[in-house]
């Protein structure tokens, strides 16, 4: 584990014909104006506003789940998994922001291309990916101050957390990361947003070495690996239904109470705003929160960094 050196994220090419860059799908993108921007993902809608941009339309999750205050004039054009293509075109957009990890959105590339609508795909499972997206957005808006405030300053926050953890030289805890929803639960490795942060902080994710956990989450496998910390992220409209599933299918097992993580009180329900949705300008808070749970000995020092 090493605290990363501050990185300089490459600026998009600015020409007389607008801003040119390559998106997360590998598509070359040129955007000439961004007066009527449509975002098909709530977290990216927020990121665009953090860069000083305004939105003509976005999907339901931006308002109903993220709770973004985008004003009364903004149009809602379906959900992030079922965007209304007619409504998108009705907004007469000059730039559409899409999520590279939602298949229903990646399928829109040809449709938007044929309609002549400039668009780009992004994914932000790591802070560096968020920083690159913010760099592109701020190149459009010209708001270098917001890139500093919502990007580079956050990068420094993360570096401070990682440096503190690294210098403490504490034993690396074994952890289990669970993603729960109303009808089930899956163990997650390090190839997702929260898993990547845990790895950065030195945690050893038992699912990275035990593929059986990823394929079939069972109490027997969890008992065999006996993690020191268990982290739960819920998804879906009802957090309570996800927690009910866990209670009925995992916690009801008599062996659950014998797990080291449960006995030591190291079973944590993580904040969806920081660990399910993309934290954007709150990435530093996400890292501090996880670090304090992994290494409670450092809680006071981490709090001082806030």
Describe each PLM feature range.
Residues 43-46, 61-64, 95-104, 125-129, ...:
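Solvent-exposed loop/turn segments at secondary-structure junctions
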Residues 29-32, 68-76, 201-211:
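A local structural motif
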Residues 62-64, 186-215:
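Alpha-helical, coiled-coil/dimerization segments enriched in small aliphatic residues
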Residues 104-107, 122-136, 170-193:
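Extracytoplasmic ligand-binding site segments that recognize negatively charged/polar headgroups
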Residues 129-141, 145-148, 234-306:
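Structured C-terminal subdomain patch of bacterial secreted/periplasmic proteins
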Residues 1-43, 145-176, 293-306:
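Bacterial Sec-exported substrate-binding components of ABC uptake systems
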Residues 41-91, 95-102:
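A short, structured surface patch at a secondary-structure boundary
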Residues 23-24, 75-85, 210-219:
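Short helix-initiation/N-cap motifs at beta->coil->alpha
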